[in-house]
Amino acid sequence: MHSPISGSFTSSTQVHDPIHPANSDGFRETLANVELRTKSPSAECPDKMGCCASKPQASDPNNPSTSSPARPSTSLFRYRTAELAQANADGICVGLTAEWLRNLNSHPSIRMEALVPGSQRHASATVRQKEYENLKVHLRRQGAGPSEADFAAQNTMLQKAGLAPSGKEKVYKVGEPNFPRMLTKITADGSNHLLSLYFAEGGAHTVATSAMDGNTTLFDPNFGEFTVQSDQIDDLFRSLANRYSNPNRQHLTTVTTQKMT
């Protein structure tokens, strides 16, 4: 267990059985666990968690590590407390988020330094991303649906990384009235969450949050860490959604959350 660091949107709940790490019989066991789930979010969520919706580029005046030929669209970067540049250029957001969650006890600047390209943790994130993607392909071949295979592969990788995903995922739709409930959950002191962002254009992206002492930090592998007082998380999320909308032209439609226990 890892310690936490020192517009409205209804939810429909997806409850998943815990996934166990793969061994010689692990793929069959994992697939069996997946088949026990009563409802899949696949009708709502594209099967692209490993394909990040946005990769930072270089000319955005709000952020030297991101680019846009258009006007600055959001105040997102005024919330940033630690920058991460170019770490996600190859679309390894799931692996990078796993490594960030494993390193929460470190200082923010150390966490970011540990994830820069060429570092040991960045290399580890690349390996974890590949493990996740390979297992997802295997589970699809075994008959699992896109969403089931994605969730099982993700959680197997997280467990192999020494993390403890709850095995229960909740789905929240942008523009519906229950999104504040999600914000309340991810800002509960002492909690860590894995979040998947799904976009109307078909892309998806993985981020994470950690809450402690009335503050919540959001880690986005494309940009770094953003920290706000927990009662300001709505503003941060709105700014994040705006940043992906303009200049990246990715419109957030759905957020799924899973608590890391």
Curated annotation (Swiss-Prot):
GO molecular function, one term: cysteine-type endopeptidase activity
Bias kind Polar residues: ranges: 1-15
Annotated stretches, region: Disordered: 1-48, 54-73
Root EC class: hydrolase
Composition skew (Low complexity), residue ranges: 61-73
Domain of life: Bacteria
SUPFAM superfamilies found in the cross-reference section: Cysteine proteinases
Pfam families for the chain: Peptidase_C58
Catalytic residues, chain numbering: 93, 205, 220
GO terms of biological process kind: proteolysis
InterPro entries recorded: Papain-like_cys_pep_sf (IPR038765), Peptidase_C58_Yopt (IPR006473)
Stated family: Belongs to the peptidase C58 family.
Biological role: Potential cysteine protease, which may play a central role after invasion of host cell.
Name the record gives this protein: Putative cysteine protease YopT-like y4zC
Species whose genome carries this gene: Sinorhizobium fredii (strain NBRC 101917 / NGR234)
Organism lineage string: Bacteria, Pseudomonadati, Pseudomonadota, Alphaproteobacteria, Hyphomicrobiales
